[in-house]
């Protein structure tokens, strides 16, 4: 909870209290082994936790999908899509930018395949086997509880399920602050229940 805001900590304390009242057994701490491992090879946060898997897969699979659409499609590759967006910027194609597309398109699907495979193995091992699997099996847990969507990254990389339950609204304290007169509304705050592979039925049951 060190990175949570004070309102976030208050909400999480309330969540834990309600779960306890409903009969849940809260195990705290339940540290992710790959986060606390002193060996850099086995530490999820080493090297900034960077992985090429999402970007590589995006380019590979997007190009493969475009090939299935036939000749009527106006763009045939991710590169062509990026170029089309740039050419039509005045029409609003880049309202939110395309940094994710740019990063993916920088990869070469042949030359970078080796790095992708290494990163994929590391993602599965540190997020899954030495991460979620290990802590849940060692402590005999039904689920891991995360504030908001903070557990989405560690569960997404090995393809594990997460159920996010809306719970409250909390005050927003942006840094830097918003301009004077800006009416900043409270933001929604949910809690995430994450499990091991194929544990969706148990998560929904909880």
Language-model-detected regions and their locations in the chain:
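Residue-level preference for alpha-helix termini and adjacent loops
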Residues: 3, 52-53, 57, 64, ...
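Gly/Ser-rich, acidic/histidine-flanked active-site/gating loops
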Residues: 1-72
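Acidic/polar loop patches that form or flank catalytic/metal-binding clefts of enzymes
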Residues: 22-31, 73-79, 143-146, 163
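Short, solvent-exposed polar/charged micro-motifs at secondary-structure junctions
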Residues: 36-45, 90-92, 173-176
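N-terminal leader/propeptide and maturation segments of large enzyme subunits in energy/redox metabolism
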Residues: 52, 58, 64-125
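Glycine-rich, small-residue loops and helix-cap segments
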Residues: 13, 18, 95, 99-206
């Amino acid at each position: 909870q060190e990175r949570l805001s004070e309102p976030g900590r208050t909400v999480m304390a309330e969540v834990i209290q309600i779960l306890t009242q409903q009969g849940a057994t809260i195990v705290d701490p339940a540290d992710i082994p790959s986060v606390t491992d002193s060996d850099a090879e086995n530490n999820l946060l080493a090297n900034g936790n960077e992985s090429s898997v999402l970007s590589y897969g995006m380019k590979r699979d997007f190009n493969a999908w475009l090939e299935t659409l036939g000749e009527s499609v106006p763009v045939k590759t991710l590169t062509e899509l990026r170029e089309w967006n740039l050419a039509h910027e005045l029409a609003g194609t880049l309202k939110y930018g395309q940094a994710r597309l740019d990063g993916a398109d920088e990869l070469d699907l042949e030359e970078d395949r080796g790095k992708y495979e290494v990163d994929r193995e590391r993602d599965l091992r540190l997020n899954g086997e030495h991460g979620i699997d290990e802590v849940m099996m060692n402590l005999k847990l039904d689920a891991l509880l995360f504030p908001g969507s903070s557990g989405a990254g560690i569960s997404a990389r090995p393809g594990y399920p997460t159920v996010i339950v809306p719970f409250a609204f909390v005050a927003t304290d942006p840094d830097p602050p918003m301009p004077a007169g800006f009416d900043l509304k409270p933001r929604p705050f949910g809690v995430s229940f994450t499990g091991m592979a194929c544990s969706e039925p148990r998560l929904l049951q909880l």
